[in-house]
Amino acid sequence: MSTEASTGETPEFQSYDHRGSPTQEAMKREIQSLIQNLVKLSRTAPAIHVLIPPEIVMYVEGSRNPDIYNREFVETVQRMNQMLKGRSEALQALQAQIAHQLQIAIPEMKDDIERAVEATGGKVPITGITLDP
């Protein structure tokens, strides 16, 4: 049940800083300016080609904030980078371990092993130093 029906009074509306005609004219100018800007925007939009990923469009259409999408995307990329960095470091350690073991097992191939490892960006451990398995 509404307040009007229960009290029998009509609701009151208050306006702050309304100065009659000058306020209406200012509001009219603002609305006209908004309409003109929207018309300009709709005319220039076809000439501007910006590729927006469909995921972001769907995110916005679902009334979600694209800044949150960006933050989640950056966090995902950081996690993946950390994971790949860990894998890369593990493979480098494996390469060094294999090179070290090959140098011990086949000492006459030491120079070839060093060249192969260095050609792939790795470093050969100094012979005589044992690496943890």
UniProtKB/Swiss-Prot annotation:
Any GO BP annotation: regulation of transcription by RNA polymerase II
Disulfide bond annotation, renumbered to this chain: none
GO cellular component terms listed in the entry, alphabetical order: mediator complex
Predominant cellular place of this UniProt entry's protein: nucleus
Bias (Basic and acidic residues) ranges: 15-28
Pfam families: Med10
Membership in a protein family: Belongs to the Mediator complex subunit 10 family.
Function, as annotated: Component of the Mediator complex, a coactivator involved in the regulated transcription of nearly all RNA polymerase II-dependent genes. Mediator functions as a bridge to convey information from gene-specific regulatory proteins to the basal RNA polymerase II transcription machinery. Mediator is recruited to promoters by direct interactions with regulatory proteins and serves as a scaffold for the assembly of a functional preinitiation complex with RNA polymerase II and the general transcription factors.
Name of protein: Mediator of RNA polymerase II transcription subunit 10
Species: Phaeosphaeria nodorum (strain SN15 / ATCC MYA-4574 / FGSC 10173)
